[in-house]
Amino acid sequence: MAYRAMSEDNTSVIGFASSGDGYNFEDRPTEPMYTPREAFEAKLVPGGNSGCEDPRLTKIGETIYMLYTAFNGKSEPRVALSYIKLDDFITRCWNWSRPILISPPNVPDKDAALFPKKIKGKYAILHRLGVSIWLDYVDDLQFGGNKWLKGNVIMSPKDELPDTEKLGISGPPIETREGWLLLYHCVSRKTQPMTYYVAAALLDLKDPSKVIARRKVPILEPETYYELNGQVGNVVFPCGAVVIGEDLFVYYGGGDTVIGVATMKLSELMNSLITWAGLETELTKLVKKK
């Protein structure tokens, strides 16, 4: 697991921890696996927030790509990209590539992740511009000059519950036979401070710009003391999930202070999405027979 950690002077770095069962992370080195290295993530305001935030990792072939939010305390937060060879990651030789910015200057852009496979021969990248989730396709991962992330909106707050202010992806989509399972966070202005909760959607396998199912009620919301309180209260904020056996493990930040895990049967979530959308699939037929 890659996770964001913050020092006493509010510098964000990325730590590493591993687990044999998905619950207990006893293997947790004291040194970070990734630290700020470039001017766009250096601390420009003493004591202010800066560094590398909210990493999302995607394995494609023998390479692990990491998209994260780079912030120096003055400029708008932007999406940065770095990568590492799978063998180096496994052996913890942190030979990360030099990071590059991939989102446009002077525009706040966050919550980005790569799909775990190319779509029609192109890299597919989800990111958040403004208050909505965008999808962009690119031929390669070379950015700069006049080439920046853009794309089109695929999900926006107007399609959520009435009090939703903004939303962003929780982590890379998970491929299922029914579609790409996308977990995403929503920010509700019903409370102060605002509440971050998690919802789920299903994207078309061949054309993920098509949202084929969307469960607008939360699958995870702040309930415990450590989710309701902390550096920022009323927050559950995942950056990744994994399927282990028949279960979906969702790893999230609680109250911007601790890391938790929530689990549920993948089949139950998929069935609720499909039922919510009124879709008739092999999965729903099987459930009906039972």
Residue ranges and their predicted role:
Residues 51-56, 110-115, 169-172, 237-240:
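Beta-propeller and closely related beta-sheet repeat lectin domains
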